[in-house]
Swiss-Prot record:
The chain crosses the membrane at residues 15-34. This protein is one of the nuclear-coded polypeptide chains of cytochrome c oxidase, the terminal oxidase in mitochondrial electron transport. It is found in: Mitochondrion inner membrane. Its main location: mitochondrion. This is Cytochrome c oxidase subunit 5C-2. One of its GO terms (cellular component) is mitochondrial inner membrane. Belongs to the cytochrome c oxidase subunit 5C family. The lineage of its organism: Eukaryota, Viridiplantae, Streptophyta, Embryophyta, Tracheophyta. The keyword GTP-binding does not apply. It comes from Arabidopsis thaliana. Disulfide bonds: none annotated. InterPro entries: COX5C.
């Protein structure tokens, strides 16, 4: 019975290269989403001020 050997998975430490690649990928994805959000907000603000300058909208409530 002492001759039976069971194959067990050996645990390895973290792979530095794999961790760097995963971190870089997640960072770039999050940064890209943040930039897209920022560009969208910037576009909305620019549109608002363009309409305000042309007189198509106003910031004061009109009296009826």
């Amino acid at each position: 019975m002492a001759g039976h050997k069971v194959a067990h998975a050996t645990l390895k430490g973290p792979s530095v290269v794999k961790e760097l690649i995963i971190g870089l990928t997640l960072g770039l994805a999050a940064g890209g989403l943040w930039k897209m959000h920022h560009w969208n907000e910037q576009r909305k603000t620019r549109t608002f001020y363009d309409l305000l300058e042309r007189g198509e909208i106003g910031v004061v409530a009109s009296e009826e």
